[in-house]
Structures are given as C-alpha cells and as structure tokens.
C-alpha cells in the first residue's frame, strides 16, 4: 500500500464485529502515453494499467518534418505527462503511432509517403521527450488494443477504415507483424487492376477505393456525407453501396488467407449500420 500498488476498497459487510477492509489493485499506479501525429493535429492520450483512457489532449498543430516541430511536440508531451503524473501515477513511457512502415527494429520509418517522413528516426521524433519512447504502426497499435480487451481472440484480420485505411493480423492470440513489420497492409491489396493511382505508386489499391475520403462529393465533408445518407438521399445511398462492395471484396480477399474473425474499425466504421455489415 505504501508503494501505491494497492489501495483501500469498500468495507466488507459486518458479520458481528468490525467491518473488514478490502484492498484492491490500483490501476493508476503506472500510466503510459500514446501520441498520434496527423497533418493538422496532434493527439495525446494517457492510459492506466487496465488500458483505460484516463486523460486526453488534442492540439491543432500542422505537421512539419523538422526539428522545430519535434521539439515543440516534445514540450507538449512533457507538459501532458506532468499533468498526468499529478493526477495519476508515474508515466512509464511514450508510444508514437505512426502512419508508415517501420524498420524491423522499429527505430526508423522506411516508408512514410503519407506524412512525407521516410527515413525519420525515433531519435529525432523523441529528441525533446523526457521519457522512454517507441514507435509502432498505427494499425498494429489498434490491433494490440483489441487483444488487450478481448483475450479470446485467436486469429483475426483487422480492417481500419480511416482516411488512410490500414490493417493488422492477429495469429495465435498475438499480433503478427512478420519479419519486416508490415504484415496486414490490406490497404495496398489490388482491388481493381489498373485502377486509381495510389500514393504507394501502384494502381487499384484498396486504399483508393475504401478510404472514406472517396465518399463525399465536391466540397462535402465526410461527416456531411453520412448526415445526408441518414436522411435517405438516393445518390448518397448508391455511393455508399458501391463503397461497401469494395470494402466487402477486400475483406473476402483477406479471409481467403486468414480464415478468422474480422474486426472492422476506424472513422468510417462508426457510421456503419448492422444492415451495412
């Protein structure tokens, strides 16, 4: 108790004498911080030892692959960590969820076309952070959260329908990244041979057909699209059905390799109805 590992819980019911004191595990004894860098935003969250989010912070901060940017986010992360430690427990470390493929030792971004940071190292990103740091592919981080909260998962394909879609593979109850840290890159599966050009240089990738960015019409936002869709507008329903066909084909293709559960997440997934699934 003096070390903070356990804390007093509720008193037990009396059986005639003084009520006995219960003790319980203190999940806030240690915490960890997750960081997501996006083109126009920096997102931070802190979790406790149960994996529950205990603090959040979002900053409108345009991404720049410069030392000045990494020094600035280092200050933001350190201040956030200090606030977390005041309210909760000591911060064990910081994990950066990366939109890109990492080197086998997870210290360098070897394919970072989305953010324009190929070759960026962990040392550079974390240069001003006062805590141990690591990098992980953002889809892999999401898959690890799935495993944390559902210990019954054995084999699964994770499909994350973000603006830049991604995927991950769970095999034997563990995240399976493969020797090159790039297993589960469903976003670069060819759906339409010779189709739309992808940022990776290929044509017809799943990304170019299953990104929610393909749904809105000119000058329409993604939330705006789904708002009109909910009103039953016919043209939006047709666009949605075509998009769902591509998503379904990607899932079918993936399940032909790994015949396990399918976990669908990401920004677009929150708008899907049971009938869509």
Predicted region positions:
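Hydrophobic "anchor" residues
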Residues: 53, 108-109, 175-176
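Glycine-rich phosphate-binding loop and adjoining helix at the ATP-binding site
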Residues: 57-155, 274-277
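Glycine/GP-enriched mid-protein hinge/lid loop-to-helix segment characteristic of carbohydrate kinases
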Residues: 56-58, 65, 123, 127-235
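Short glycine-rich anion-binding loops that position phosphate/pyrophosphate groups of nucleotides
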Residues: 99-101, 162-164, 268-269
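ATP-binding/phosphotransfer module of carbohydrate and carboxylate kinases, centering on a glycine-rich
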Residues: 1-9, 14-18, 22-60, 64-90, ...
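Short, acidic, Ser/Thr-enriched surface-loop or helix-capping motifs
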Residues: 48, 104, 170
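Short glycine-aspartate micro-motif
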Residues: 32-36, 91-95, 156-160, 166
